[in-house]
């Protein structure tokens, strides 16, 4: 695992879930986090490569890093406002 991903304060395993479930779970998890905390999302749904960055932009969260060259995909986000 890349070092940047190992710094996450929270982890969400969305393996095996299909759209829209991964983003719904991300939203639920982020709601329970404090501003500035980080979340590692692990998923294998190809739709997440589009949905997670869009979610972050729409909800004012920061996509710190993503690894989508192979499954499982990994995303590290930082909760915004």
Swiss-Prot record:
This is Sulfur carrier protein TusA. Belongs to the sulfur carrier protein TusA family. Signal peptide: none annotated. It comes from Shewanella sp. (strain MR-4). GO terms for cellular component: cytoplasm. Transmembrane segments: none annotated. SUPFAM superfamilies: SirA-like (SSF64307). It is found in: Cytoplasm.
């Amino acid at each position: 695992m890349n070092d940047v991903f190992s710094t996450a304060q929270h982890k969400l395993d969305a393996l095996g879930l299909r759209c829209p479930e991964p983003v719904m779970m991300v939203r639920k998890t982020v709601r329970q986090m404090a501003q500035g905390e980080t979340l590692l999302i692990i998923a294998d749904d190809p739709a997440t490569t589009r949905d997670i960055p869009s979610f972050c932009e729409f909800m004012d969260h920061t996509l710190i890093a993503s690894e989508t060259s192979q499954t499982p995909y990994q995303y590290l986000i930082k909760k915004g406002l």
